[in-house]
């Protein structure tokens, strides 16, 4: 069990989905419950950032509200870092139903000596499956005050390890692990992916 905090980011408005995503079921289980189950395998503390209090009650987890409103996911990361019991947090979006413990542990290892460890995935980064330390708090606050609300906007102000895609692929099928559910068609695809897995969870062990 890692002495760190797993954070489920659940405060999004889900405009493209048209309803709250956290409670939508994939593999006969709410997405937020799937994510929580994986994080509980790895982290000594698991919390929810944003979203409704009922989600925390269902899962027996503490919900931390935004302290600086209007910054989207960056506000959620800030609230989580301020409220976490440990110095480092792995932040995971609630709409990533196929994350795996192996990647979570590896990302924590890759955060040693850095304020942020973020995966590369193709031409993009995965800032909502990334490790952030409490050393980021001031930089995030500075970014939010300047209305720079993309998660990666504060990265130039801190020490960042951009984790190679090749190393991640050695641990898991990252096309599956990083699949996120934004639209109704994504939800259909995720349910098919889960159904095609005997365990209801699609990852490489």
From Swiss-Prot:
It catalyses: Mo-molybdopterin + GTP + H(+) = Mo-molybdopterin guanine dinucleotide + diphosphate. Its cofactor is Mg(2+). GO terms for molecular function: GTP binding; metal ion binding; molybdenum cofactor guanylyltransferase activity. It holds the Pfam family NTP_transf_3. Gene3D superfamilies: Spore Coat Polysaccharide Biosynthesis Protein SpsA, Chain A. InterPro entries: MobA-like_NTP_Trfase (IPR025877), Molybde_CF_guanTrfase (IPR013482), Nucleotide-diphossugar_trans (IPR029044). It is found in: Cytoplasm. GO terms for cellular component: cytoplasm. Its EC number is 2.7.7.77. Mg(2+) binds at residue 95. GTP binds at residues 9-11, 21, 66, 95. GO terms for biological process: bis(molybdopterin guanine dinucleotide)molybdenum biosynthetic process. Keywords: Cytoplasm, GTP-binding, Magnesium, Metal-binding, Molybdenum cofactor biosynthesis, Nucleotide-binding, Transferase. The keyword Membrane does not apply. Its main location: cytoplasm. Belongs to the MobA family. Transfers a GMP moiety from GTP to Mo-molybdopterin (Mo-MPT) cofactor (Moco or molybdenum cofactor) to form Mo-molybdopterin guanine dinucleotide (Mo-MGD) cofactor. The N-terminal domain determines nucleotide recognition and specific binding, while the C-terminal domain determines the specific binding to the target protein. This is Probable molybdenum cofactor guanylyltransferase. It comes from Pelotomaculum thermopropionicum (strain DSM 13744 / JCM 10971 / SI). The lineage of its organism: Bacteria, Bacillati, Bacillota, Clostridia, Eubacteriales.
């Amino acid at each position: 069990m890692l002495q760190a905090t797993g954070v489920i980011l659940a405060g999004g408005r889900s405009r493209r989905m048209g309803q709250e995503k956290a409670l939508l079921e994939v593999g006969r289980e709410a997405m937020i419950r799937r994510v929580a189950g994986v994080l509980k395998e790895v982290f000594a503390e698991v919390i929810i950032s944003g979203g409704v209090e009922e989600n925390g009650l269902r899962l027996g987890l503490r919900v931390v509200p935004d302290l600086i409103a209007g910054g989207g996911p960056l506000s959620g990361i800030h609230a989580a870092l301020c409220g976490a019991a440990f110095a480092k947090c792995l932040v995971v979006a609630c709409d990533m139903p196929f994350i795996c413990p192996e990647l979570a542990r590896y990302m924590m290892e890759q955060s040693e000596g850095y304020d942020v460890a973020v995966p590369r995935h193709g031409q993009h980064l995965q800032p909502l499956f990334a490790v952030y330390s409490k050393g980021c708090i001031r930089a995030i606050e500075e970014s939010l005050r300047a209305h720079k609300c993309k998660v990666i906007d504060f990265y130039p102000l801190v020490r960042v390890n951009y984790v190679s895609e090749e190393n991640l692929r050695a641990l898991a099928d990252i096309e599956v692990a990083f699949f996120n559910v934004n639209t109704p068609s994504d939800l259909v695809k995720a349910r098919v992916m889960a159904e095609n897995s005997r365990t209801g969870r699609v990852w490489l062990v």
